[in-house]
């Protein structure tokens, strides 16, 4: 079992990388790479939990929309930032 401090640190790293990406002109390809990375991490630290299911819902809503990659990334980051304090 992975301890909560490790989960918190890993999730914070995902968020930080997403925030760094937002400082650039985010392309769809860049967003997709970050999304796969973030999804993989969430699966490892929260597989089958409410956090994981909630993130999958956010991902589905971004895929079903025609918003810009920057906005998609923002939606994902908003969710991850929201659950970060709950992980610790």
Located regions from the model:
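Charged interaction/catalytic cores of defense and host-pathogen modules
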Residues: 1-88
């Amino acid at each position: 079992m992975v301890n909560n401090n490790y989960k918190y640190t890993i999730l914070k790293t995902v968020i930080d990388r997403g925030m760094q990406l937002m400082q650039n002109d985010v392309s769809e390809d860049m967003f997709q790479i970050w999304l796969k990375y973030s999804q993989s991490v969430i699966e490892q630290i929260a597989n089958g939990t409410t956090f994981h299911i909630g993130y999958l819902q956010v991902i589905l809503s971004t895929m079903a929309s025609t918003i810009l990659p920057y906005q998609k990334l923002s939606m994902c980051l908003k969710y991850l930032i929201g659950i970060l304090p709950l992980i610790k």
